[in-house]
């Protein structure tokens, strides 16, 4: 998705599905070789490729997809393999992880400062600047080569708007190289 000259790629989106009847942990373990881990059961699917987590309430959390349609297909696959009805499946969208590129270098080591719209610190361990974007309610990890990863976003469009906003802020503060 390109907005304002910035191409945003969704890397992952957590999606939770609430079936009419809760999914039984024991059924997933015995019928599909799911793995119990505390109060959850984990099952990796090959087609569609996804990791499915059955939470303590019997809801289905799908991890490892970047499209809601693929996550829904994974949840339906699980239900059908268990012999359960897949109708009435409610969808709840979780956070998005996305990436984009500023297409220029960034002086990340000089980004320990307050900006209108957020705060930035340089993380020496990661080798990037971390922007807590209060305007768009997400976090940006910015590397010196211009590569950026957004986490905690609620929608890809918010990442795109954040990318355009921060590109302008970095230009304004002479931090783009």
Label for each model-derived stretch:
Residues 1-141, 145-147, 153-177:
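Intrinsically disordered, low-complexity polar/charged tails and linkers
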């Amino acid at each position: 998705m390109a907005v304002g000259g910035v191409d945003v790629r969704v890397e992952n989106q957590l999606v939770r599905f609430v079936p009419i009847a809760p999914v039984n942990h024991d059924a997933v373990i015995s019928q599909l070789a799911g793995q119990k881990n505390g109060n959850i059961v984990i099952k990796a699917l090959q087609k569609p490729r996804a990791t499915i987590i059955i939470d303590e309430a019997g809801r289905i959390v799908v991890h490892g997809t970047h499209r809601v349609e693929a996550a829904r297909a994974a949840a339906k696959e699980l239900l059908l393999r268990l012999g359960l009805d897949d109708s009435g499946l409610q969808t709840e969208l979780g956070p998005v992880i996305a990436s984009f590129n500023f297409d220029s270098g960034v002086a990340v080591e000089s980004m320990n400062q307050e900006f209108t719209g957020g705060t930035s610190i340089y993380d020496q361990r990661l080798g990037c600047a971390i922007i807590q974007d209060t305007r768009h309610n997400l976090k940006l990890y910015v590397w010196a080569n211009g590569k950026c990863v957004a986490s905690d976003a609620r929608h890809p469009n918010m990442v795109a708007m954040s990318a355009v906003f921060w590109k302008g802020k970095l230009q304004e503060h002479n931090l783009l190289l």
